[in-house]
């Protein structure tokens, strides 16, 4: 799991082929699943649906995605533009939290970890949404 967490962005960010990574096949597969790709003829929305559904093929990929989202929502307020915040929050509600529910059903042994991730993600997202709403109302 740790190797997947550390390497999950390497293919997208560095153009590395997952098969070239000096790690187990389990990690290679998880990293490959976490590499977002829009296939020829796909819209970005269709690609996202495919991507999030494919993550369920690997416990490591699914858990890493959720851990990464938890980390990213925790640091996004000070670094994302308002438009990026809105988009990221929408993706979190539409794709990430449904993924979390599916992961909980598929990997019940991780339900304690998933509870903490869900609680943290929702708490941070709710706080940011409330802050943005107050900001918009006070314009």
Ranges and model annotations:
Residues 1-139:
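Active-site helical microenvironments for divalent-metal-assisted chemistry
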């Amino acid at each position: 799991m740790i190797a997947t967490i550390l390497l999950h962005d390497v293919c997208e960010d560095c153009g590395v082929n997952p098969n070239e990574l000096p790690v187990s096949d389990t990690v290679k597969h998880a990293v490959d699943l976490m590499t977002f790709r829009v296939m020829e003829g796909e819209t970005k929305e269709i690609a996202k649906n495919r991507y999030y559904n494919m993550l369920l093929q690997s416990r490591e990929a699914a858990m890493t995605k959720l851990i990464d989202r938890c980390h990213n929502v925790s640091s996004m307020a000070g670094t994302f533009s308002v438009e990026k915040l809105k988009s990221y929050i929408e993706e979190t509600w539409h794709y990430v939290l449904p993924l979390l529910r599916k992961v909980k059903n598929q990997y019940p042994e991780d339900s304690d970890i998933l509870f903490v991730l869900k609680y943290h993600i929702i708490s941070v997202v709710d706080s940011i949404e409330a802050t943005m709403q107050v900001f918009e109302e006070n314009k």
